[in-house]
Amino acid sequence: AYAFGLLMKHWAPNFLKQNPAILGSAEVSSIAVLLVVVLVVLLVSVAVGLMFALTSMRLKGTYFAMLTLALSTALYIIIKSTDLHEWTGADEGLHGIPLPLWLNPTQNRLTVYFITLGFLCVSYLLLRRFVNSPTGRIIVANRENEDRMRMIGYNPVTYRAIAFVVASVFAGFAGMFFSIWNMSATPTMISAVTTVNALIMTIMGGMGTLIGPIFGAAISQTIQQFFYTWFGARWPLIFGVLFILIVMFLPYGIVGTWRLQKGNIREGWKRLLKLFATKTEADAGQKPPSV
């Protein structure tokens, strides 16, 4: 989000001002500049993912989570620093990010929505393809049992780094679209609150699944809106109680629990239908009473 905001606010306007029609027309030039910015966002996301992977490659479990949270908090503090106020806006952030007319949410909100929706669908298909690839299957197996993967000749650290970079790239693009929608980039985007919200959505939907976090995000945001309307300022307390209940009774999330129980549910329906069919045949086979 900040890489996109910094480039669009500080570099892109100056470049287009000095080269208004470098590719023949101002509109084509603005699209080309936007593509360059997207490419830089991709490179920055890869670099951040590698940084996190290299600094936490030897850690597991709680220590791994603590270090990644500490690194994100360090970035949050750096961005809020008053020494970088001229570039990052410090506490205020970057507001009024200049965007092309067709990508401006204040004037073409529906267009931006469908572009974002298209990106979500493409991302899901790409990640589905990646998970089903040989590398993706090794990453999944590495998540389940690192020691076993090491015994059969794979380096868990390498595949964990690949997973980190892939996740960082898609998170970077998600941040870019979030900054486009709000036309701003603020420190809260990389704060611990944002991290916790993402974890809540993932846990509610189902960890270890691709469709789960999507359902979790939709359900979480919808519930939060209703709870805010019904309970006002007390909605976080009610939402917290609901989240605890979900963790207790749906420990694998909504999608994860459904997948685990799908066979039992299907078998239950078969038994129920068989019971109804048997009863219907028995009723049909009974002779009418004699008069």
Per-range role (PLM):
Residues 1-291:
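Transmembrane alpha-helices and adjacent helix-loop boundaries
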